[in-house]
Amino acid sequence: MRFAIPLGAACAWAGVALAALQIAEDDSTITLNNDRFKAVWSKSKGSVVDMFLDGQDLLGPQSGSTGIGPYLDCYCVPSGFYTAGATNPRMQYVEGTDSTGTNYAGVILNDTYTPTGQQFQQYWFLRDGETGLHMFSRLAYYNETTPFLRNLQEFRTLFRPNTQLWTHLTSSELQTAPLPSKNAVSKQVVVQDATWRFNNTPDDAYYTQFSEYFTKYTFSNQWRDNDVHGLYGDGTNSNGSTYGAWLVMNTKGPLHSDLTVDGIVYNYIVSNHHGEGTPNITNGFDRTFGPQFYLFNGGKGSTSSLQDLRSEAAKLADPSWNAEFYDSIAKHVVGYVPSSKRGSVDGRVKLPKGATNPIAILTVDGQYFQDNSVVPSSYQYWTDIDTSGKFRIDRVVEGKYRLTVYADGIFGDFVRDGVTVKAGKTTTVKEKWDAESAGKEVWRLGTPDKSSGEFRHGVARDPTHPLHPPEYLIYWGAYDWQSDLPKGIDYRIGSSDPATDFNTVHWSVFGPTPDNPDVEYNTTHDWKINFSLTKKQLRNSKKATLTIQLAGAKTASGNTDVYNASEPYINLSHESYINDQKEPLSFVIGFNQSSSCIVRSAVSCYQVRSRMEFPADWLKVGENTLTLHLPYNATDTETAILPATVYVQYDALRLELD
């Protein structure tokens, strides 16, 4: 790759004016600014170190790793975390005019981690008339001596302010709250990894309005539902002017979820907090991720509300936004695929009766869509399907894809491999989705929607705080199994209420919690589902099928996908007993299917499902009982402050007769 040579580089200070857009460079910094927005990069840090909107400091003073950003870091070197630019940062700028006639300037960081030879590039671009930074992030590894390095566990950019300007954080309408005060943070009590209790400061605005507990996972969100997230300053510390700092997500998941904002505005590009797979870094690995856009809005004299500034940012969450600009800067960005090498998919799928909220996903051919990372060079696209079954996905990099369609209310997915996309062409797809069936449905429990949120302490709103966040987002230890379900789960089809009588998580062991030191083993591991059958239902039936769909499951591997033979529950067996049968219906949740789901405030993670057939004569006229069994007191070794128990989270269950 060739870079534009900085003009006047031999001088102590160089300045280049592009109409209102200006570039300045000295021995230690590069500065880009236009009429309203200014960003300063430190050549020695490889990061933005100062940022201003209408003269207002958005970052605050530098202190260690705070007061800087956006910057790039990862969990990807043999020792773990690494911040791009920490070894030998080489900073250069580029400039130009895009195809729309708009001037732009960019700053490019190059850094090589010497022990492994991993190459990092971070790109930041500012356009004239915009108040934000367009960003791309690249990691490359070429090493024949060590062809397998490790997994790319985390790859992210962070806007990490150190200022009282910001007063609120938000990742959705339901996940909006005041930031905890410095006083609350100074007196917080650790209850779990990255989770604190503010019981020592009950008058703090976060405590009174949102929750007694704070965890970065409370504001995590699924990418399908996440257009924009960030920070808001209500003017309290900025002379009445309001400000917003947003990560605009014009590329998404859809089931992937992770951290969004907790005082830091994150762009989690690759991660596995909720059990998604991560790509391996092997010889030849070379990926450029982006674009993403950090927008800073409001400004001097602004009285715009959080909702107004958020809505302004959300309008930019469109993959086609600024496409001409991205094509113009593709010559600067290694690995970015321009529009000339992209095509479209125009499809129509006849949906099964009862399908709602359908979605179409393009992922790597031949693989389950949540395993897209097994091919590190793969891409992923998705779009909602309208009520007539139509969808269109534009700007798809040419190649061969798997099409997956799923919908709320329908068990299973529709899958078609071999969807070929050619540059400049539109691929047409017409399909009919016949919902899977193993006979006549006798009953179902839960809604097949890839979430356990409909059950107790799931999406139900917290009644004790005026902002009423969904209960699952708070912290699992805020609730007490022994108080909620002292006799365990004894559910009756047709009369029990799934929102109160079926828990969002099936623990092997529960506790302790901050308010209850007891550990409960006896009522947690076996759950009973009772149901009645008539003679008519059983007549002529030879085969029964039990379908269990899990929205998430935790084995002893947690969210690492690492096999450890010393852990007895590294692969977790889930067993279902029909009436008094001694032999269970079993399926194994593999170590590479495990998620750290509910303990990190999620009800939808890596999906696992099984359809198990058994003789219909195991059932009887009248009362029947299905027992869902996890191993008794099944735990693992945790290196972080997290519950050691294994658990599963049910999406939905169904019994069919044939």
Swiss-Prot record:
Record localization: Secreted
Statement: the UniProt record of this protein carries the keyword Protein transport: no
Alphabetized InterPro entries for the sequence: Carb-bd-like_fold, Gal_mutarotase_sf_dom, Galactose-bd-like_sf, GH-type_carb-bd, Polysacch_Lyase_4, RG-lyase_II, RG-lyase_III
Signal sequence interval, chain numbering: 1-19
Catalysed reactions, as listed in the record: Endotype eliminative cleavage of L-alpha-rhamnopyranosyl-(1->4)-alpha-D-galactopyranosyluronic acid bonds of rhamnogalacturonan I domains in ramified hairy regions of pectin leaving L-rhamnopyranose at the reducing end and 4-deoxy-4,5-unsaturated D-galactopyranosyluronic acid at the non-reducing end
Chief location: secreted
One BP term from GO: polysaccharide catabolic process
Glycan attachment sites: N110, N143, N239, N280, N522, N530, N564, N571, N592, N633
SUPFAM superfamilies: Galactose mutarotase-like (SSF74650), Galactose-binding domain-like (SSF49785), Starch-binding domain-like (SSF49452)
Functional description taken from the UniProt entry: Pectinolytic enzymes consist of four classes of enzymes: pectin lyase, polygalacturonase, pectin methylesterase and rhamnogalacturonase. Degrades the rhamnogalacturonan I (RG-I) backbone of pectin.
Top EC class for this record: lyase
Entry similarity comment: Belongs to the polysaccharide lyase 4 family.
Keywords, in A-Z order: Carbohydrate metabolism, Cell wall biogenesis/degradation, Glycoprotein, Lyase, Polysaccharide degradation, Secreted, Signal
UniProt-recorded name of the protein: Probable rhamnogalacturonate lyase B
